[in-house]
């Protein structure tokens, strides 16, 4: 009765250790790929990453796809090169430090707040959860104002920044996203019909800015426009948010022009193209 006990205890570490070793190796390889992409200061081809890692293309692609699903990397351009993803912001600053994005953006946000008199936000796209994440904000001085924490998330279909991102996607991409996420109703004004949402996105593309008309919170309006990188890919958006009593119907176009101008300024300063 005594002999089997040590044998059972001796086998357990071996069973647990083998998978752990493989998992650690995959994690190490994935992190090294992430570092090489960050050091490229732009984007890099799959074959080049595989060569640097000393791995087959298939293994490298599997690791990259896993990180892409979590939003840490993204594919850009017609050649499908790999670049740092926005979700890296959630665990580190690689995405922002690559070109001191916040240092570029914040003065423009402050100028936009002073010009509009309303709270101004900057958001990036979380590709894993398909939500807009606020990474910077300049609040207005009004007692009644929009207030959301840095790191706060907003739904794609019911927010200014989210709809600005959606408007840059193809109809097929939008349809896939809607099937995956659904269209939750936050207020009576939320666009819960795919047809109505797609019509709204068409208007967004035509105007150059999105318009959240009490679709996420009653009494709150928001207008947003995208910022583009050097691959003409949208990766962030600037928005103006305020109560319907100040963002009135007759001023919507005026605020829209302001946010378009600010987004273009950031795109240019960042070295992006539209």
Report the location of each language-model feature.
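Short, solvent-exposed recognition segments
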Residues: 2-3, 9-13, 138-216
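N-terminal helix-turn-helix
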Residues: 2-96, 102-103, 110, 264, ...
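Short, structured helix-loop boundary elements
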Residues: 23-27, 46, 81, 85, ...
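A structural signal for short hydrophobic beta-strand segments in well-ordered beta-sheet cores
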Residues: 73-75, 122, 227
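Amphipathic alpha-helical effector-binding/dimerization core
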Residues: 78-79, 83-180
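Cysteine/selenocysteine-centered motifs that mediate thiol-based redox chemistry or coordinate metal-sulfur cofactors
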Residues: 173-176, 182, 263-274
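Extended hydrophobic
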Residues: 189-263
């Amino acid at each position: 009765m005594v002999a089997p006990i040590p044998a059972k205890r001796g086998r357990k570490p071996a069973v647990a250790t083998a998978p752990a070793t493989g998992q650690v190796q995959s994690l190490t390889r994935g992190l090294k790929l992430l570092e090489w992409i960050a050091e490229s200061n732009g984007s890099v081809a799959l074959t080049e990453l595989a060569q640097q890692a000393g791995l087959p293309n298939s293994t490298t692609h599997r690791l990259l796809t896993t990180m892409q699903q979590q939003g840490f990397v993204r594919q850009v351009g017609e050649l499908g090169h790999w670049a740092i993803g926005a979700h890296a912001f959630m665990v580190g600053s690689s995405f922002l430090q690559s070109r001191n994005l916040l240092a570029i953006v914040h003065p423009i946000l402050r100028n936009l707040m002073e010009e509009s008199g309303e709270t101004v936000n900057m958001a990036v796209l979380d590709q894993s959860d398909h939500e807009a994440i606020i990474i910077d904000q300049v609040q207005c001085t009004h007692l009644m104002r929009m207030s959301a924490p840095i790191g706060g998330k907003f739904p794609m279909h019911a927010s200014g920044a989210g709809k600005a991102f959606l408007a840059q996607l193809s109809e097929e991409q939008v349809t896939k996203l809607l099937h995956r996420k659904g269209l939750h109703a936050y207020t009576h004004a939320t666009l819960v019909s795919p047809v109505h949402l797609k019509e709204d996105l068409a208007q967004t593309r035509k105007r150059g800015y999105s318009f959240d008309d009490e679709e996420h919170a009653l009494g709150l309006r928001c207008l947003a426009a995208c910022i583009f990188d050097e691959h003409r890919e949208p990766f962030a958006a600037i928005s103006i948010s305020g109560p319907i009593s100040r963002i009135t119907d007759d001023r919507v176009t005026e605020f829209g022009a302001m946010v378009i101008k600010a987004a273009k300024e950031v795109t240019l300063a960042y070295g992006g193209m539209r």
